[in-house]
A protein has these predicted regions:
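Glycine-rich, highly charged phosphate/nucleotide-binding loops
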Residues: 1-6, 56-86
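Conserved beta-strand elements of the Class I
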Residues: 21-23
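NAD(P)-binding Rossmann-fold cofactor-contacting core
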Residues: 26-30, 38-57
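A short helix->loop->beta-strand "cap" motif at the edges of active sites that frequently abuts
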Residues: 43-45, 95-98, 118-120
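Short, charged, surface-exposed secondary-structure boundary motifs
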Residues: 57-60, 74, 110-113, 131-137
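Mid-chain, well-packed structural core segment of small domains
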Residues: 71-109
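Rossmann-fold NAD(P)-binding glycine/threonine-rich loop
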Residues: 104-130
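A charged, well-structured terminal subsegment
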Residues: 131-155
Length: 155
């Protein structure tokens, strides 16, 4: 599988994903991980918090690791620094995830190679919430409900 970096690929990944394990999810509403996970939960995804520091986040049980999650997950969304991603990639492979997603500003080629070699799809340096809103029309949550993003002025 190649690295997913085009609109068609991102649309497919988001449309096929039902469950998202969010590694590094914070219980604090003002943290980017919480904001993105809440958005995805509000848009019908099953969000599975992964953070050893909490027992519950967003009304869901919080697990200390991917391995501790009962049952399968479709996507592993990483809110950790780039150096922390390779072990998470190995856990995602062991868990049987389909997608390893590294958030905006995060790229790790070693982690990508681990996931790609095991057949996972990989997204790097993109925010799942931003991509969902941009591609699948969840723009109304941000206060815009056109369904279309344009760089051109109307008129």
């Amino acid at each position: 599988m190649p690295i997913v970096d085009d609109i068609a690929g991102l649309r497919r990944v988001l449309a096929q994903t039902k469950s998202i394990a969010v590694v590094g999810l914070s219980a604090h509403w003002y943290r980017p991980s919480y904001f993105a996970a809440k958005y995805m939960q509000d848009h019908g995804y099953r969000v599975i918090p992964v953070n050893p520091g909490y027992s519950e986040v967003l009304g869901q049980p919080c697990y200390p690791s991917l391995a501790a999650i009962p049952g399968p997950v479709d996507m592993v969304d990483c809110f950790r620094k780039a150096a922390d991603i390779p072990p998470i990639a190995r856990e995602a492979v062991a868990k049987g995830a389909r997608v390893l997603w590294m958030q905006l500003g995060i790229r790790n080629e070693d982690a990508a190679r681990i996931a790609l070699d095991a057949g996972l799809e990989v997204v790097m340096d993109r925010c799942v919430k931003i991509e969902h809103a941009r591609i699948l029309g969840g723009l109304n949550w941000a206060g815009v409900n056109t369904g279309v993003i344009s760089a051109r002025r109307a008129g």
